[in-house]
Amino acid sequence: MPQTDKQVCIPPELPELLKQFTKAAIRTQPPDLIQWAAEYFGAMSRGEIPPVRERSEQVPLSNWAELTPELLKVLHSRVGGRLIIHADELAQMWKVLNLPTDLFNSVMNVGRFTEEIEWLKFLALACSSLGVTIAKTLKIVCEVLSCDHDGGPPRIPFSTFQFLYTYIAEVDGEISSSHVTRMLNYIEQEVIGPDGLIKVNDFTQNPRVRLE
């Protein structure tokens, strides 16, 4: 193979382009990520609007069940508290609930999951297909994970919230790590009580908590 002295020049705007691509992929949930990526970047190169579905658009699901927080809660209970689950087993659980296969594949692609899946990360991305904003996505995750049966507001350990918020913000790509750290520090120091739990109201109705 002939050698070349040419250097590959990486444009400075590439990181931002990739962030926008990742966010668009999560919003659109394409069944074939590779084909959609080709169409996305092809449109960008031609100066056209890329094929990004808005949150308000409805996806035709034919005979599939519609993904809901209630079904995600059922799925979470079947995972049984495991942190890691095998892809084939999770796919079978998803199938038993009659959930859309294309959505499962899209979450797998966006999360870059392989055979061993970190369940909380998969759950966070699945919830992001229902939530318009990061705050609403985290609200749904809290509702799914909460084990309270006393009729109180959904709540989860702050450590779990910290993990989920950091991950979702990283995938979203538009929120600086410094902002995430600042919000988490404020919540931990000013909001969280002795029980170490965070309630949905703590980050949805507190004017000083702005997750985005």
From Swiss-Prot:
One of its GO terms (biological process) is protein localization to cilium. It is found in: Cell projection, Cilium, Flagellum. Keywords: Cell projection, Cilium, Flagellum, Phosphoprotein, Ubl conjugation. GO terms for cellular component: cytoplasm; motile cilium; sperm cytoplasmic droplet; sperm principal piece. This is Ropporin-1. 'Ropporin' comes from the Japanese word 'oppo' which means 'tail'. It comes from the Eukaryota. Coiled coil: none annotated. Homodimer. Interacts with AKAP3. May interact with SPA17. Interacts with RHPN1. Interacts with FSCB; the interaction increases upon spermatozoa capacitation conditions. Interacts with CFAP61. Important for male fertility. With ROPN1L, involved in fibrous sheath integrity and sperm motility, plays a role in PKA-dependent signaling processes required for spermatozoa capacitation. The keyword Metal-binding does not apply. Its main location: other. The keyword Ubl conjugation applies. The RIIa domain mediates interaction with AKAP3. Belongs to the ropporin family. GO terms for molecular function: identical protein binding. InterPro entries: ROP_DD. Sumoylated, sumoylation decreases upon spermatozoa capacitation conditions. The gene is Ropn1. Residues 12-43 form the RIIa domain. Residues 209-212 are annotated as: Interaction with RHPN1. The modification Phosphoserine is found at S56.
